[in-house]
Every structure is written in structure tokens, then in C-alpha cells.
UniProtKB/Swiss-Prot annotation:
Tissue distribution of the protein: Expressed by the venom duct.
Disulfide bonds: C3-C13, C7-C19, C12-C24
Subcellular location field: Secreted
UniProt superkingdom: Eukaryota
Keywords: Disulfide bond, Knottin, Neurotoxin, Secreted, Toxin
Entry comment, domain topic: The presence of a 'disulfide through disulfide knot' structurally defines this protein as a knottin. The cysteine framework is VI/VII (C-C-CC-C-C).
Any GO CC annotation of this UniProt entry: extracellular region
Source organism: Californiconus californicus (California cone)
Protein name per the record: Conotoxin Cl6a
Any one Gene Ontology molecular-function term assigned to this protein's record: toxin activity
Length: 28
């Protein structure tokens, strides 16, 4: 897959995003 970040070991963020408390957020 094209996931680069995993939130809490479960939730997968796309490459341009990062994991934050509220979920995946766009990585500037």
C-alpha cells in the first residue's frame, strides 16, 4: 500500500499526511 504513517498502529495516513490527535492532518 502507499501508507507512510500509521496512527496508533491501526489507522493509515497517506504520504502527504501525518498522524495527529484528531487523525490524519496534512503535513506542511
Amino acid at each position: 500500500d502507499d501508507c507512510t504513517t500509521y496512527c496508533y498502529g491501526v489507522h493509515c495516513c497517506p504520504p502527504a499526511f501525518k498522524c495527529a490527535a484528531s487523525g490524519c492532518v496534512r503535513n506542511n
